[in-house]
Amino acid sequence: MIKAIVGRKLQMSQIFAEDGTAVPITLIQAGPCTVTQVKTPERDGYSALQIGFGSRKPKNVNKPMKGHLDKVGKGYFEVLREIRMENASDHEVGEDLAADVFEIGERIDVIGTTKGKGYAGTIKRWGFQRGPSGHGSKNIREPGSTGNATFPGRVIKGKKMPGQKGNKRTTVMNLRIIDVRPEENLLIVKGAVPGSQNGIVLIRKTNRAK
């Protein structure tokens, strides 16, 4: 059975444990999703499911996508995601998926796009230490040296420098499911997940749980 679903980050909140400890939680709208394509090793070279989530107006869908989704017959979706899995042929096109693909206590990975912070310096982006701020110093927030000398004569790849902060695909691993409410398409997860409110996330069962 599939152990992944597309959803939407709703908001963060907190609940209180029996000992009074405040536990941070994230509410995720998990589904409903629809299977839009079943890929098999014989035809496609690998086994996977393509699932759709959300809705989109017909005027915002191009002709190739309309032709693809008209075969499903359940409207047009906001996003499509492909999930590799064994025995994908056990599912059918048009099948609906809900939050009950997960259970309370399961560990999951949540994949999303982090909040974009724009162009940022090394202090905000990487946590660099500031330079001296007194006695005529002029390098309070400068990054400092970026290389060596004649050798190697270049800036090494991966050097931490100013640039775009955030707006990147990120995976938060091994989060625990606190509650599952299939009738509300709701997952309650302990901890934070990447992205802003109403951001699209992919939830999958982790393979890193201890």
Swiss-Prot record:
<comment type="subunit">
    <text>Part of the 50S ribosomal subunit. Forms a cluster with proteins L14 and L19.</text>
</comment>
<comment type="function">
    <text>One of the primary rRNA binding proteins, it binds directly near the 3'-end of the 23S rRNA, where it nucleates assembly of the 50S subunit.</text>
</comment>
<keyword id="KW-0699">rRNA-binding</keyword>
<comment type="similarity">
    <text>Belongs to the universal ribosomal protein uL3 family.</text>
</comment>
<feature type="region of interest" description="Disordered">
    <location>
        <begin position="126"/>
        <end position="167"/>
    </location>
</feature>
<keyword id="KW-0689">Ribosomal protein</keyword>
<dbReference type="InterPro" id="IPR009000">
    <property type="entry name" value="Transl_B-barrel_sf"/>
</dbReference>
<keyword id="KW-0687">Ribonucleoprotein</keyword>
<dbReference type="GO" id="GO:0019843">
    <property type="term" value="F:rRNA binding"/>
</dbReference>
<dbReference type="GO" id="GO:0022625">
    <property type="term" value="C:cytosolic large ribosomal subunit"/>
</dbReference>
<dbReference type="GO" id="GO:0006412">
    <property type="term" value="P:translation"/>
</dbReference>
<dbReference type="InterPro" id="IPR000597">
    <property type="entry name" value="Ribosomal_uL3"/>
</dbReference>
<dbReference type="GO" id="GO:0003735">
    <property type="term" value="F:structural constituent of ribosome"/>
</dbReference>
<dbReference type="InterPro" id="IPR019926">
    <property type="entry name" value="Ribosomal_uL3_CS"/>
</dbReference>
<keyword id="KW-0694">RNA-binding</keyword>
<dbReference type="InterPro" id="IPR019927">
    <property type="entry name" value="Ribosomal_uL3_bac/org-type"/>
</dbReference>
<dbReference type="Pfam" id="PF00297">
    <property type="entry name" value="Ribosomal_L3"/>
</dbReference>
<protein>
    <recommendedName>
        <fullName>Large ribosomal subunit protein uL3</fullName>
    </recommendedName>
</protein>
<feature type="compositionally biased region" description="Basic residues">
    <location>
        <begin position="156"/>
        <end position="167"/>
    </location>
</feature>
